[in-house]
């Protein structure tokens, strides 16, 4: 084992005052030569995603001690996307990714920790932790709090998206308030992150593929005992990684990020994975750009039938073999690199050796590579005169991913949702929500409320929605987000007007408005940059330093 970083605070007579502080929190003479390991605990009762984390943190803390390390637990924040969705509070969601990253980096570096075990649940916990882990490059492991089990109503599996869609169903007269109330009361049965292949489960899968969490751990249910066992094992592995000096940047390679992109295509993962992978790769110094997603999409099919557009939830994926089973299928097809390593020091080929070549026959969640749900990945990167830097279209569950129609312009999510619920949006419309980007929002809110209302009204196949904001992992339909440049910095989305004809063509990776370059420039002369919405506080600070979404909406971009 190399010299411990923590020796800066534990060794030598000049560090006697430092040691005195450590003695007060439980250190004894023999402990000052052990690795000090941070336990970044995202426990919170704000959200069901994080309310089960403390038992995992305590088990990991105990396991670190038994394995020869000294744990130091500290808290980090979470917000609940599901609770803040559709409100002003959602502007803080993506901001929380940066706060989580900054807080973990700050605590670990201030205290000269030798490693970190991060525990999280809700969407931004995972990329926030990974950004910090990449910045610090000290031995690290991530423990996912686990997925929620599906809610049940009359034999039907429910998720939180069921409740959002029920709102649209109510306003269009498809259900009554009694049914809405039943869905509300039954869709979230306990602890865990939202149960479909939404953002949290997508990002936990990304971390597993990158090798910074244990195989199978990303799809475990929060309330199952195997999750506690996995937390204990993760702590043991981390202590061993410190001894072997296995560091995150040894694992975060271009090939491992490409593997992660391949897997999110195969499982039908969230659009937010594009934003977060770009951000993590940027921090790690790996050259991954938005075009890599389109390149990989062209060759990797969707082989998992998972919600929001499919039939099954993440616990079903786990029971069918989880991410290792998906990876084995992709490995055999030559679609991922088997030489990438994980935190245990094993290559993908090594740790998948005993995984069956084919998925179990008694399930329909994972398909063979020659019988995919979709022949190409579901996250298409579109470009055109509305998005010169690119944007992300999610086309799973859409029979015809091409629509040309008149623009319906909204300057905020609230205005758009109001119009949808008033039944003002008609088949063939292209709904435009702008000034919701990283700078303009600020914070790049997720548009789950309007997209779910559109689906709930039966317009999911008949209306396109485009935005410089984001979408929830629970969104499906013909939706296009992350349009860059965004409206607030003068992107062309700021120049379109009500009724302009817009083409969204995910087949040919095109998004454009039928206006000449001359007309766009004429309109630009009259465009006025929006006045910042916030003068003080975290949103004001964020809007001044955040990058474009095509670079991951990061706040520490090298100048």
Curated annotation (Swiss-Prot):
Binding site for [2Fe-2S] cluster: 49, 122, 194
Cofactor note: Binds 1 [2Fe-2S] cluster per subunit. This cluster acts as a Lewis acid cofactor.
Coiled-coil segments on the chain, per record: none
InterPro entries recorded: DHAD_IlvD/Edd, Dihydro-acid_dehy_C, DihydroxyA_deHydtase, DiOHA_6PGluconate_deHydtase_CS, ILV_EDD_C, ILV_EDD_N, IlvD/EDD_N
Residues annotated to bind Mg(2+): 81, 123-124, 446
UniProt EC number: 4.2.1.9
Keyword Transferase: no
GO BP annotations, alphabetical order: isoleucine biosynthetic process; L-valine biosynthetic process
GO MF assignments: 2 iron, 2 sulfur cluster binding; dihydroxy-acid dehydratase activity; magnesium ion binding
Top-level taxonomic group: Bacteria
Gene3D superfamilies: IlvD/EDD C-terminal domain-like
PANTHER family in alphabetical order: DIHYDROXY-ACID DEHYDRATASE DAD, DIHYDROXY-ACID DEHYDRATASE, MITOCHONDRIAL
Function: Functions in the biosynthesis of branched-chain amino acids. Catalyzes the dehydration of (2R,3R)-2,3-dihydroxy-3-methylpentanoate (2,3-dihydroxy-3-methylvalerate) into 2-oxo-3-methylpentanoate (2-oxo-3-methylvalerate) and of (2R)-2,3-dihydroxy-3-methylbutanoate (2,3-dihydroxyisovalerate) into 2-oxo-3-methylbutanoate (2-oxoisovalerate), the penultimate precursor to L-isoleucine and L-valine, respectively.
NCBIfam families documented for this protein: ilvD, PRK00911.1
Family to which this protein belongs: Belongs to the IlvD/Edd family.
Known partners and oligomeric status: Homodimer.
Protein name per UniProt: Dihydroxy-acid dehydratase
Organism whose genome encodes this protein: Prochlorococcus marinus (strain MIT 9515)
């Amino acid at each position: 084992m190399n010299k411990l970083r923590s020796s800066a605070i534990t060794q030598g007579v000049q560090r006697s005052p430092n040691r005195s502080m450590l003695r007060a929190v439980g250190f004894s003479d023999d402990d000052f030569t052990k690795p000090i390991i941070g336990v970044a605990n995202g426990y919170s009762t704000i959200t069901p995603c994080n309310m089960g984390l403390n038992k995992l943190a305590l088990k990991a803390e105990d396991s670190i001690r038994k394995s020869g390390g000294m744990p130091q637990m500290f808290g980090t924040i979470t917000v609940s996307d599901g609770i803040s969705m559709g409100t002003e509070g959602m502007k803080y969601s993506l901001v929380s990714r940066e706060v989580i990253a900054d807080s973990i980096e700050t605590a670990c570096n201030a205290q000269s920790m030798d490693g970190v075990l991060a525990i999280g649940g809700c969407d931004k916990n995972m990329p926030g932790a990974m950004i910090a882990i990449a910045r610090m490059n000290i031995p690290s492991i991530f423990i996912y709090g686990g997925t929620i089990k599906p809610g049940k109503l009359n034999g039907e599996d429910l998720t939180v998206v069921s409740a959002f869609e029920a709102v649209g169903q109510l306003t269009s007269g498809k259900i009554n308030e009694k049914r809405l109330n039943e869905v509300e009361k039954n869709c979230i049965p306990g602890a865990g992150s939202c149960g479909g292949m939404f953002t949290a489960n997508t990002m936990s899968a990304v971390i597993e593929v990158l090798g910074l969490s244990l195989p199978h751990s990303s799809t475990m249910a929060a309330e199952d005992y195997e999750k506690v066992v996995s937390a204990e094992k993760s702590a043991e592995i981390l202590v061993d990684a410190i001894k072997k000096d296995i560091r995150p940047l040894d694992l975060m390679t271009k090939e491992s990020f490409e593997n992660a992109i391949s897997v999110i295509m195969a499982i039908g993962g969230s659009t937010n994975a594009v934003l977060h992978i770009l951000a993590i790769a940027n921090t790690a110094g790996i050259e991954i750009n938005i075009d890599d997603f389109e390149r990989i999409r062209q060759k990797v099919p969707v082989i998992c039938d998972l919600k929001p557009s499919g039939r099954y939830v993440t616990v079903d994926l786990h029971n069918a073999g989880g991410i290792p089973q998906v990876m084995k299928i992709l490995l055999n097809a030559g679609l991922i690199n088997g030489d990438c390593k994980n935190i245990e020091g094993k290559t993908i080929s090594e740790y998948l050796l005993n995984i069956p070549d084919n998925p179990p026959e008694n399930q329909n969640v994972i398909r063979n590579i020659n019988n995919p749900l979709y022949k190409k990945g579901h996250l298409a990167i579109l470009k055109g005169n509305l998005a010169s830097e690119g944007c992300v279209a999610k086309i799973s569950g859409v029979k015809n991913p091409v629509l040309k129609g008149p623009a319906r312009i909204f300057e905020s999510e609230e205005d758009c949702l109001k119009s949808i619920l008033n039944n003002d949006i008609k088949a063939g419309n292209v709904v435009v929500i702008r000034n919701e980007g990283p700078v303009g929002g600020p914070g790049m809110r997720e548009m789950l409320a309007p997209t779910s209302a559109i689906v709930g009204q039966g317009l999911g196949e008949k209306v396109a929605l485009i935005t410089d904001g984001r979408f929830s992992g629970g969104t499906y339909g013909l939706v296009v987000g992350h349009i860059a440049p965004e409206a607030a910095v003068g992107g062309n989305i700021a120049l379109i007007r009500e009724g302009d004809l817009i083409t969204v063509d995910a087949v040919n990776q095109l998004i454009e408005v039928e206006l000449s370059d001359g007309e766009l420039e004429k309109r630009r002369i009259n465009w006025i940059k929006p006045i910042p919405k916030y003068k003080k506080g975290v949103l004001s600070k964020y809007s001044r330093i955040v990058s474009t979404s095509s670079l991951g909406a990061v706040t520490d971009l090298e100048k």
